[in-house]
Amino acid sequence: LMMICQLAGFLGAGKTTLMVRLGKELSKAGKRVAIIVNEVGEVGVDGAVIEAYGLRSVELTEGCICCTLSGSLQNTLRIIAKEFKPDIILIEPTGLALPSKINTIIRTSMVEVDRNVSVALVDAYRAERLFKETKAFFSRQIAGVDVIAINKVDLVPEEKIKEIEDLIRELNPGSRIAHISAKEGEGVRELIEALGVL
């Protein structure tokens, strides 16, 4: 059966970089991976563009494709599940999509899913400012997820990361937290373990 992992986070948090890194790591581990993004061009990857079944996709590595959202997310999920038969689908919704809304779409998509895991990517560099400026939305995005990945940990001091972690614990006490640098690849393996994918 198939697993779905959606990645929430504000614009600039590093979602696309992390998606590509996760896709490559998981396919190296023998998993068939499909990534759904709003626009393949944003991924900035080289690769043969595959125009199949109305989906514009790019092959990232052996066993890992990246597809542009085609019409509705439900439709895209159905096409990918039927034609590509992935072990894992990684979804990068827009920065303004709440995980709870995406969960509803997944539930009503008529695709058989073994597990649906949601991750919020928090930009360590901008977390405090984003929390102050968009408190209600930031809180809802954090509260509704299974795993929180604090990204860009290589750019901020340890005590700052601790403060962000305390804030996250207040908003979502039951979540697992991973410290990563998507750009450097640091902590990505630990994040995969926290997701329970491998």
What role is predicted for each listed range?
Residues 2-8, 13, 17-129, 136:
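Nucleotide-state-sensitive switch-loop elements of NTP-binding domains
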Residues 132-144:
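Flexible active-site lid/hinge loop adjacent to a nucleotide/diphosphate
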Residues 12, 95-96, 153-154, 183-184:
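Short beta->alpha junction loops/turns
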Residues 147, 154-198:
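Canonical P-loop GTPase G-domain recognition
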Residues 49-52, 141, 167-171:
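Short, conserved catalytic or adaptor-binding loops enriched in Gly and charged residues
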Residues 34, 114-122, 142-153, 171-181:
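Conserved beta-strand/loop subsegment of P-loop NTPase cores
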Residues 4, 81-85, 135-138, 162-168, ...:
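A general structural signal for short secondary-structure boundary/capping elements
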